[in-house]
Amino acid sequence: MAYVKERIYESMFIIAPNVPEEEREKLVERVKGIIEERVKGKIDKVERMGMRKFAYEIKKFSEGDYTVIYFRCDGQHLQELENFYRITPEIIRWQTFRRFDLEKKERKAQSEKKEAEVSEGEGGTEA
């Protein structure tokens, strides 16, 4: 089986404002569970942005509770997350992005770290 590189994703979803706060927390935990179990991802960061006003109405709501989750996975099972969003009526909007900019930053930091280790190793052999 071929090795598939782990990628960084950002998933933003909006929960309807008529859902009680306790249920919103449970819904966020369910999304995290799906990312870890079904998508086989590793969560880096969860940002609860809270209630925000919309620029226009979405499904007859003028505001919603925003949550952003940054996670890593190989991307093969992302459809599981999309399916969950689609069948959950409390989630009124969602979008999942691959974060090329964060991947690039991470690769650059790793290459700089390797270069520093190599130059450190070379400096130690000369003494």
Swiss-Prot record:
Q: Name one Pfam family in it.
A: Ribosomal_S6
Keywords recorded for this protein, A-Z? Ribonucleoprotein, Ribosomal protein, RNA-binding, rRNA-binding
Residue numbers spanned by region Disordered: 106-127
Q: Cellular component per GO?
A: cytoplasm; ribonucleoprotein complex; ribosome
Could you name the domain of life of the organism this protein comes from?
Bacteria
Q: Which GO-annotated molecular functions does the record name?
A: small ribosomal subunit rRNA binding; structural constituent of ribosome
- One example of a Gene Ontology biological process annotation: translation
Residue ranges with Acidic residues bias: 118-127
Tell me which stretches of the chain form a coiled coil: none
- Residue stretches of biased makeup (Basic and acidic residues): 106-117
NCBIfam families assigned:
S6 (TIGR00166)
PANTHER family in the record, alphabetically? Answer: MITOCHONDRIAL 28S RIBOSOMAL PROTEIN S6, SMALL RIBOSOMAL SUBUNIT PROTEIN BS6M
**Function, please?**
Binds together with bS18 to 16S ribosomal RNA.
The family note in this entry says: Belongs to the bacterial ribosomal protein bS6 family.
Supply the name of the protein. Answer: Small ribosomal subunit protein bS6
Q: Which organism is it from?
A: Thermotoga neapolitana (strain ATCC 49049 / DSM 4359 / NBRC 107923 / NS-E)
